[in-house]
Amino acid sequence: YSNKIKNLDSKLMEQAIDGMTTLDQDVHTNYFDLEQARAFSSSLEGSNVGLGISFYLNESKNFVVSNVYINSTADKKGLKPQDEIISLDDLKCSENDSDTIIKYIKAHEGQNVKIKYLRDGKEYTTNLIPGTFDSTVVCNVYEGYGEIILTSFSENSGKDFSKAMSRLQEAGIKKLVLDLRNNGGGYLNAALEISSSLIPKKSVVFKEKDKDGKFTKEMAKDEFNQVKMGKIIVLQNENTASAAEVLIGALKDNLGDTVITVGTTSYGKGTEQVTVPFSDGTSFKYT
């Protein structure tokens, strides 16, 4: 009703709405103002602009690749963890701070950037085009096992995870380390899609109970091919929550002793939220 009352302070109105929607019984029901709604939506999208890597600075002040996000421009060009980036075009990494480098990359979205990097002491040059990438799935192939790091569950996580599993399958990998530490969840449908890449078709991924006590079953999706693993080791901690816990439950229920969980007890969130967007850009998330 704020638009029907003249000169009503918008901040006061937001505080009133926030007070009405904040429940001690359910900390997951929230009203988001414009800034909070944008931040929440961005966190679910998992979308970033860049080369598709995370990195750290070494003693030479060069940028060492720590992770390469699957399906990104860096991934498509074959960059790997421990590659040491020396320069981007004429911009030397050792002479610039990380903020300058990141700004340069973002400013050249859609344009060729010449990258010089070291791998095992040998210098290489390649052209990368900074662009949009999903920052939720990292896939590494090691001697005898594969590692997939899943940071959250975005709209694209399911297909990116499927691509990662295909990569492990092509490499003949039969042991998977699935890192879900600090994964706070995201889209439940993404957990459904990811489960479908690991468990048999027609398997139950999870059951939902509505407010009337009615149960519905969600089954593994047919369009995702199961890649069989001889052993799956899941890494979890106290910040592993929501959709990540659904995924762990689906794997343990359907694959039994094939799955081993390692780490501390997960967060323990078994409820699903729905987000309702409003025309002014704010939104309401409720259980």
Q: What role is predicted for each listed range?
A:
Residues G185-T287:
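Conserved acidic, small-residue-rich alpha-beta core segments centered on
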Residues E84-K116, A190, K269-G270, T275-P277:
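PDZ domains, with a preference for the canonical peptide-binding region formed by the helix
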Residues S2-N62, N112-V113, D120-N127:
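Extended, small/polar residue-biased N-terminal targeting/export presequences
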Residues S154-K174:
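A short, well-ordered alpha-helical element
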Residues A74-S98, L176-D179, N254, V262:
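Conserved PDZ fold ligand-binding element
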Residues V141-S157:
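STAS-typified acidic loop motif
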Residues V64, T100-C139:
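PDZ-domain C-terminal substructure recognizer with occasional recognition of PDZ-binding tails
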Residues A16, M20, I53, A74, ...:
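Terminal peptide-recognition signature
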